[in-house]
Amino acid sequence: MKKINLKDKEIEKIINNEQQRQEEHIELIASENYVSKDVLEATGSILTNKYSEGYPGARYYDGCEFVDQIETLAIERLKKLFNVKFANVQPHSGSSANSAAIAALVKPGGKILGMSLDAGGHLTHGYKISFSGTFYDPYFYGVNDEGLLDYDVIEKLAEKIKPELIICGASNYSRTIDFEKFSKIAKKVGAFLLADIAHIAGLIIADLHPSPVGHADVITSTTHKTIRGARGGIIMSNDETLMKKIDRWVFPGYQGGPLVHVIAGKAVAFGEALTPQFKKYQQQIISNAKAFSEEFKKVGTKIISGQTDNHLFTIDVKSSFNISGKEASELMHSINITANKNSIPNDTLGPKISSGVRMGTPAMTTRGFKEVEFKKLARIIIELLANSTSSNLESLKLKLKNEVLELTKAFPTKDYYL
């Protein structure tokens, strides 16, 4: 991609250094991706100059006729993608979306039941350092010994706790989520159901994962992971009464003026997601993840839950390579492979060290990786981690880094990916 040219040379240098890092590194962080040139240009447009508190047709500022058109188009495209009646595209992030949705569904101090962090949940699903664990009364469900959701156990827990809200969805769960079963549990105990599909939204759009529409009362997501759009959040529902409450919590509850330039980037990405190419891309993401994980399994590497049904998986590096997640991710970074340490179920090392490393395929699939490249990448990572205490580690790292650079040169970042 073309390097940026600014009058502010300090910022120019840093941005161009980051661009070079992105070009020369293999990106395995499951929550990251590369946007198209069109998304990038819309997000960096003159729309950043316009303030537009409120919603289309009901703004507190004049001169919003064109930003109204953009936000309306984003909403209509999003509704079409997920076949929903109502949508809000203003949240600045997935966390912002969750905060507004939860506030609309539960009063402060109310009970919420979400997935525990070490089992694959997210901070905003009730973790103590998040708003959801500070202003609400959080409880958690986990996974069984196989790393799978046990819906019978979750049902019994819900019957005991009687939460006002159940949150389903995860930031690190590699298997299919049964939204219908969650819905039955929520209805049985009289709870609202919130589906956080931030990681799997693109797969749902492509009909490669069951949709929560028709099962969840409210659906939240980010727009920059598998949707491959501008960074932000969205909220959807088929319940008009709930959606009106959510809209009020987004604005004026938690946010002021929306980021119109980001909403434009979201709208462009939603348009791209409506194309046949987008479904092929999502299919390749899953095929790559399966091939990638199977290559690790060939040498006995432990995959949490045993396999992947989606775009990510986590390897237990502690039991497989006798190395912590922090050490493993730092080693990988030293040879230009970017991933992230991640807690695993019943992790004894804590989130800052952890026993796992999460692997995601969306970003490198965008750059053109197929199964053969991911298999080669797995072998590079295995060789690195298996020799973490070798006396020849530095020379090995140099060799493997050169192999990584060969891959990144063969699959450069491009101006347009579709």
From Swiss-Prot:
PROSITE patterns to which the protein is assigned, alphabetical: SHMT (PS00096)
Catalytic activity from the UniProt record: (6R)-5,10-methylene-5,6,7,8-tetrahydrofolate + glycine + H2O = (6S)-5,6,7,8-tetrahydrofolate + L-serine
Binding-site positions, (6S)-5,6,7,8-tetrahydrofolate: L117, G121, H122, L123
This enzyme's EC code(s): 2.1.2.1
Gene3D superfamilies assigned to the protein according to its UniProt record, in alphabetical order: Aspartate Aminotransferase, domain 1, Type I PLP-dependent aspartate aminotransferase-like (Major domain)
Cellular compartments per GO CC: cytosol
Site-annotated residues for Plays an important role in substrate specificity: H224
Named cofactor requirement(s): pyridoxal 5'-phosphate
GO biological process: glycine biosynthetic process from serine; tetrahydrofolate interconversion
Disulphide-bridged cysteine pairs: none
Entry's localization field: Cytoplasm
Recorded family membership: Belongs to the SHMT family.
Function per UniProt: Catalyzes the reversible interconversion of serine and glycine with tetrahydrofolate (THF) serving as the one-carbon carrier. This reaction serves as the major source of one-carbon groups required for the biosynthesis of purines, thymidylate, methionine, and other important biomolecules. Also exhibits THF-independent aldolase activity toward beta-hydroxyamino acids, producing glycine and aldehydes, via a retro-aldol mechanism.
Name of the protein this chain belongs to: Serine hydroxymethyltransferase
Organism: Mycoplasma mobile (strain ATCC 43663 / 163K / NCTC 11711) (Mesomycoplasma mobile)
Upper taxonomic lineage: Bacteria, Bacillati, Mycoplasmatota, Mycoplasmoidales, Metamycoplasmataceae
